[in-house]
Regions:
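Catalytic-core regions of glycoside hydrolase
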Residues: 1, 35-37, 108-117, 122-236
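N-terminal substrate-binding region of glycoside hydrolase catalytic domains
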Residues: 1-81, 202-236
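A generic structural signal for short
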Residues: 18-19, 85, 127
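An active-site-proximal structural segment forming one wall of the substrate-binding cleft
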Residues: 27-41, 62-110, 133-145
Length: 236
């Protein structure tokens, strides 16, 4: 039986000004709906989701440069080095923690905010992604804001392996295990984060093109269609 639900939430639905937040309309309805079904919500705030409208809050629309791209269905990537955007992100994280740390309706908060889908990358435009210092500041802002609620980030980058943060594999059973260095489990091993599961949650999303048959008894496995149980057992 299912006990968790997942939601991507644009930052524009959670924040309407530098110190103005709209959790009541942007988050409460989702949390209450999940609770009514006996579930907890796993959520990820985002700014840039390919194919969808930008999640940049309106009050920043004239302040932050947006870079157009065509990959992944197209979209607009914000200038993450913009001081007003940085300030807004830190303000959001702080208020988010004050309002929701320890809220029993939340299962896990995936940090999101940065990169395509909130996945902490802008591939193939790697130079658009913020540098290690800002990445670390966001990671630590979340850890400082949330003392009880579980956290996850997409990759074991900068100082995340040493923080109270787990990891999520958004291509689960597609590029989870194996000898390819950018696959999920090898990146955990390389970052010495493969024991993180003992204290922090490991999760993710079954790669969309695998979802239709990954649980079939007679599935034909391949390099990019991996054994689900093996992936679960390896990553814990």
């Amino acid at each position: 039986p299912a006990s968790l639900e997942f939601a991507y939430i644009p930052l524009s639905e959670l924040m309407s000004g530098p110190t103005n937040f709209t959790f009541e309309t942007g988050l409460e309805t989702r949390l209450n709906a999940a609770e009514e079904r006996g579930h907890q919500l796993v959520l990820r705030p985002y700014i840039d989701y390919p194919k969808l409208d930008s999640g940049l809050p309106d009050f920043l629309s004239d302040e932050v440069e947006m870079r157009a791209y065509s990959e992944h269905g197209g979209g607009f990537s914000p200038d993450y080095e913009n001081p007003k955007l940085k300030s807004a992100l830190f303000a959001f994280i702080e208020e988010f923690g004050q309002e929701y740390d320890g809220d029993s309706r939340i299962g896990v908060i995936q940090l999101g905010l940065l990169g395509f889908w909130g996945e902490w990358h802008t591939w193939p435009h790697e130079d658009w992604f913020p540098g290690p210092e800002f990445q670390s500041e966001i990671l630590n802002a979340y850890v400082n804001a949330f003392n009880q609620t579980l956290l996850q980030v997409r990759y074991p980058i900068v100082d995340s392996p040493n923080l109270r943060i787990g990891f999520h594999d958004d291509s689960f059973a597609y590029s989870t295990v194996g000898d390819v260095n950018w696959y999920f489990h090898p990146t955990l091993v390389a970052a010495e984060a493969n024991e993180s599961w003992r204290d922090n949650p490991i999760g993710g999303e079954i790669r969309p093109e695998l979802q239709w048959d990954i649980f079939d008894e007679n599935i034909n496995l391949s390099i990019e269609k991996q054994d689900f149980d093996l992936c679960v057992n390896t990553t814990h």
